[in-house]
From Swiss-Prot:
Source organism of the structure: Acanthamoeba polyphaga mimivirus
Biased composition (Acidic residues): 856-869
Record-given protein name: Heat shock protein 70 homolog
Recorded coiled-coil stretches: none
Function: Probable chaperone.
Similarity section: Belongs to the heat shock protein 70 family.
Amino acid sequence: MDNKLNHNDDNTLIQTEDVIGIDLGTRFSCVSIWRNKRFEIIPDQFGNRTIPSVVSFYKSAKLVGHNALCMKDANPKNTIYDIKRIIGRRMNDKSIEQTKNLISYELVSDESKHENILVQLDKSDYTLTHKYQYKPEEICAQILIEIRRIASQYLQKPINKAVITVPAYFNDAQRQATLDSAKIAGLDVLKIINEPTAAALAYGLGSEKWNKKTGGNVIVYDLGAGTLDVSLMNISNGVFRTLAVGGNTHLGGEDFDYLIMNHILIDFRKKHRIKELQMSKLSQLKLKNSVENAKKLLSTVDKAVVCVDDFYNGKQLYFNLTREFMEMVCNELFIMCMKPLKDVLDSSGLTRQDIDKVILVGGSTRIPKIQKLILDFFKNTQINALTMSLNPDEVVSAGASIYGYIITNKGDPFSDNLVLLDITPLSLGVETLQKQMTVIIPRNTVIPTKKTKIFSTDTDDQDNVNIKIFEGERKLTKNNFHVGTFNLSGFEKGPRGYPVIKITFHIDINGILQVTAHEKKSDIQNGIKITSTWGAKGRLSKSDIETIIKEAEQNEEIDKLYSHKIGLVHRINSVCNAITINLKDNEITLTNADKKKIKADIKSNLKWLQNKDINDLEVTELEKRENRLNKLYAPLIIQIGKKSDFKDYNKDTTTAEIHGDDNENDGGIYERIVLESDPSDYEKEEIKALTATIQDLCKNIINVVNNPISKFSREDIDLVTDYMETIQIWTYTTTATSTIEFIAKINEINKFTEDIMKKYEDTKIFEKNDSFTYKDELQLTCLTLNECIKSNYFSVKKSEIDILSKTIKDTMFWLLGHQNEDNSVYKEKLDQVISICNSVYHGMHRIKELENQPDIPEDSEDSESEDDTTTSKDSESSEITENLALPTNKIRENTSELLKRLPDKIKSSTQNKNDVLLKIDLNKLNPNTDIKYKNIDNHYR
């Protein structure tokens, strides 16, 4: 069908071929169309504006959408949902293991070398007339078929074309699998666009007038049922430029549901004294649906009821869920939801003050706590309100329909005013000497782009080279991903460094990478086209990309060392090569005996390099050999510059000249300007360590005040808990660039806790009362130790932790079935637990007092013997440090120096012996208790 446009009498643009916009969501999907200068959400025949992304197989029927959703309870093993979590992945993907625990149907491998996933229906259900195994693409196609049917029925015409949205982090395999599903559904997908971009389009930001010449910086915060997707875009004159993306592939509304479910199940087991709760899939689904509905209600009311009839052995599950309880239970997940905001700002180099607008997308952004945390993150900026005037469940689909109109109506001025630009998620480059990664297109480069670098050979008489293309952020190619390889051959032979090979990387608007290599002297050229720019199908996910970047940061020092070693080896080879060439020059006035000695020396150095692995080479030895060669044979090295055509291109090939659309400053030498307020790398490490310390401190103080045997008032418990949670959020949202501000925050926490403790000067806060029995003490001990293990507080061998964990688990289950035993029985059990615990407890690494921390050599972190010494010194420290043994923090030895440099107005006027620890007088603790309880989780208060 030709795509023609007609105009009626009142100049309204009419589209003769409709393009629908589809938001294919984890839990619900939505479809819309742009026509007559506005978008319309297309409802189904019952008026529902969203369609459940669910497919159910029942006898000879395939049910999709709302009909399938009704079958989740009655037919759980044959009802398929959350397919978006599965599509485009492989069976060995770590996220699939997590997903398998959250679904009621079965996933199996197709037993091929690729380990593709198949959805397995219930084989025992003989009423099914369909096959029992389906590919995820087939399930997804059924949802798209239903969407297409609804759209065709609404528009009263066949629908063939669509624009489909996907999360920004979707890799090539997931995008390709989505396209395959659309093909199965009979849809021609004109474009797959990112969900955040679609949301920005729906809000009409392309035509908005911004105060800055550079346009507006917009954050799209998309928190759905299964994923969190945060994108930062710059919008200027209709151009949408993605600056950074972040998020979490497995964090969304469903994660809140499951966390609430777990706490409700703990309460149910405790009420009914159930040792091991083995509920059916049907009961699990009923509870899940009830929790989800209650959670939605809590966005508008303060209390909701979770109720499931005949939940387990005829027992009813009943739980009063309050907004306060939900916020407490999900607090850590809510804080995790804020981290991507900081990540995208850091990645783009912008600050909170640079952001002009924040758009909320996804049903989970309706949660009041999420909205409050986002506003707190942008406190003291121009963001006073969040943009959420459109329905967050529908806004992405609306944007997709707008884009569908734009690309099919090029003649419309409305279409000419908008351009979408994507970015490369990982750096692209080639393998050079010693398997180094030489980056040609850096990560986060806007596409389309084209960049070129000059290279040469590293061996004499070479007439061909293999050009290996990699993607990733590590310095060595073995740590990155191989994208493709091609060969350039037939150029003129010559000494190493003689050929001039120009390698060009070009990525077009569709993300297709083309690499060409051209040897200038012989005019030989070859290339390769890689349609899957981000790698082989099924290989990379967003979590993989995040891991690559994280590993690159963690291994930065190791990578620098390897690069330095490789550079030294390369320079020694170059010097030896230059000397060997010049010895053949007749102008060199040396006797044959001298030449023979020099050749033997050069051969010895080269042989030494060949026989050594790069890991075994010492930097000092390499530097020593390089300096010796440079000093001893300086005249011979200089002489090569006088030779005619041959130039040692090899001497610094990795810093070759750059052509194309690189910045004009590339290749130049400039003085680095460092502002006084900029933190050094050293300070950044200290800030990171101090942040971790503050977070641990807050968590431990919360656990102490919520201890069930403590005598803190409810008012003070709530006051301390709220204050500490506010401090935790501050650590994620602060723009502080000085360690002084972080240490001042620690002092502020200590001052706050001191004020609280003054109220209890004459009270034994943890004094054991008569009603606190050995059974209570045993239960509390197990809960405390269990939470400590979960929080990774014990720095000991895994085998010891496993023994302790098993003992605690067995004891807790034993307690469920032995509620009325003699007190001596509970004491015996308690002694057993304490006996096993003591060996672990005394093996822990204690946290050092900040002001008393001794100087430790920087390399001590790698020395086990020095760790042992540190531990023994710690055991001799103050009673508070020993008894409130916190996890080892990451603050290095210079912290004491930082404290000394603090201005007087920040440092306490009195010497606080334990600046990081909660100020508690241990004389008020129960002297008969061997275990000091410090880590009771919030939900027990």
